[in-house]
């Protein structure tokens, strides 16, 4: 429920609407991500990136605000490379 609420908030903050497939894909990915973070099963090779665009910075700010309740509830911090994955996923949708 918290993940779907956060996705809804993110859409509102960005002023866009994701289609059902995108929402479902984000829900599954973020739910699995949270499970990995809670169990402290991180990926062995975290993806390195150098994204400094203003568009990504804006997305990152909105993402962190939208998912702050999720991070607080599960006591996790969603890593920047995961935010970048979601950013790329949404851009391709």
Model-predicted segments: where are they?
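A cross-family "folded-core" feature that marks the main globular domain of proteins
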Residues: 1-93
């Amino acid at each position: 429920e918290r993940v779907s609420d956060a996705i809804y908030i993110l859409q509102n903050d960005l002023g866009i609407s994701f289609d059902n497939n995108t929402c479902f894909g984000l829900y599954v990915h973020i739910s699995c991500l949270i499970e990995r973070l809670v169990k402290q099963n991180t990926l062995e090779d975290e993806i390195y990136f150098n994204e400094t665009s203003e568009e990504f910075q804006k997305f990152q700010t909105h993402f962190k605000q939208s998912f702050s309740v999720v991070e607080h509830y599960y006591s996790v911090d969603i890593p920047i490379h995961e935010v970048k994955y979601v950013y790329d996923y949404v851009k391709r949708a």
